[in-house]
UniProtKB/Swiss-Prot annotation:
Cross-referenced InterPro entries: UreD
Subunit-level organization: UreD, UreF and UreG form a complex that acts as a GTP-hydrolysis-dependent molecular chaperone, activating the urease apoprotein by helping to assemble the nickel containing metallocenter of UreC. The UreE protein probably delivers the nickel.
Compartment(s) where it occurs, according to its Swiss-Prot or TrEMBL record: Cytoplasm
Family statement drawn from the similarity comment of this UniProt entry: Belongs to the UreD family.
Protein name: Urease accessory protein UreD
One Gene Ontology CC term in the entry: cytoplasm
Annotated gene: ureD
GO MF assignments: nickel cation binding
Record key words, sorted: Chaperone, Cytoplasm, Nickel insertion
Principal cellular location given in the protein's record: cytoplasm
The protein's role, per its UniProt record: Required for maturation of urease via the functional incorporation of the urease nickel metallocenter.
Region (Disordered): 298-319
Domain of life: Bacteria
Length: 319
């Protein structure tokens, strides 16, 4: 049987806020990608935000595949990047005579944000099949007045089919660095987060304790949050867990927050993260988020009217 070469897909995008003689034209994008990536039509959301879905045309990743995404946001640009479907990673261990130990599929995402820019990185669920090996890196560089939100959910094994990750493994590395505007001041690492889930960590009570779904949300805020405002925000985020199943925790960053989900339900993880997403918009007096058109959801994860500008936490306009 003919051996197929692995994919080495790249996607490079640049976002720019445009002003025309007729007024604010919002954020536009330039760039391109190589197979298996394909860009769908971008839409202009509220507040001039460019909403761009990325399609992975191969239908999933196998061992040896490598994907690279680079996002560059100019001053005052706003964008929401999502994926068209859940990303599947197929089993690798024991499937090849050349590599019986399996091969890793890898994805690297690099984000560079300029002053007053705003990036929402919201891919759909990642599904790892039994014996899959997947490693992802997310690197973000941004100044103190830029906003970055990411929410990622991974399912370790096809639970509905009675499948676990078995000998598979998932590794994740997130690095978030605040650039200094002063030449003599060094950049500051706001978050360096590394996870390695596989083996005993999947079943141990100090690990996932046999819970098949794990999720992380990170928000780097574009303004300082004082003690009272941050405390109130965390209380509201914790109240958003009501009616959802799983273990959900959140804590503060130097300028933002991080939330974790572990449990049985990617739906409940998505619901909680969507509510937090709405909170971060309301806190900055931005329009309530709308679920991207490519998300195949049968239920609405946001409240009927989403969140109005919070009365407990004063809204701050960033730009």
């Amino acid at each position: 049987m003919q051996r197929l070469d692995p994919w080495h897909g790249r996607c490079e995008l640049r976002f720019e806020h445009r002003q025309t003689e007729h007024g604010d034209a919002g954020t536009v994008h330039q760039g391109g990608c190589s197979a298996p990536f394909k860009l769908l039509r971008a839409e202009q959301g509220k507040n001039g935000r460019c909403e761009l879905p990325i399609l992975h045309t191969a239908g999933g990743l196998v061992g040896g595949d490598q994907l690279s995404i680079a996002l560059d946001l100019n001053t005052n640009s706003r964008c929401l990047i999502t994926s068209v479907a859940a990303q599947k990673v197929y089993g690798s261990i024991g499937r090849s005579r050349l590599h019986p130990e399996g091969q890793w599929a890898r994805q690297q995402v690099h984000c560079k944000l300029a002053n007053s820019s705003d990036l929402e990185w919201l891919p759909q669920e990642l599904v790892l099949y039994a014996n899959a090996l997947f490693e992802q890196h997310l690197t973000v560089q941004l100044p103190a007045n830029a906003s970055f939100l990411s929410a990622e959910i991974v399912r370790l094994g096809r639970t509905a089919a009675g499948e676990t990750l078995q000998q598979g493994r998932w590794r994740s590395a997130l690095s978030l660095c605040r650039r200094s505007v002063e030449p003599h001041q060094a950049s500051r690492w706001e978050l360096v987060d590394r996870l390695d889930l596989g083996g005993d960590a999947l079943n141990d009570q100090h690990g996932l304790n046999k819970r098949p779904v794990f999720g992380s949300l990170v928000w780097a805020a574009p303004m300082p949050l004082n003690g009272e405002a941050l405390t109130q925000l965390l209380e509201l985020v914790r109240s958003d867990r009501e009616g959802l199943n799983g273990t959900m925790r959140c804590s503060a960053l130097d300028q933002g927050l991080v939330a974790r989900y572990s449990g049985p339900s990617s739906r409940d993880a998505r619901f909680w993260f969507s509510r937090i997403w709405a909170r971060t918009r309301a806190l900055r007096a931005l329009s309530a988020p709308q679920i991207p058109r490519v998300w195949p959801l049968q239920e609405q994860p946001l409240p009927p009217s989403s969140f109005k500008t919070n009365t407990a936490v004063p809204a701050v306009r960033t730009h």
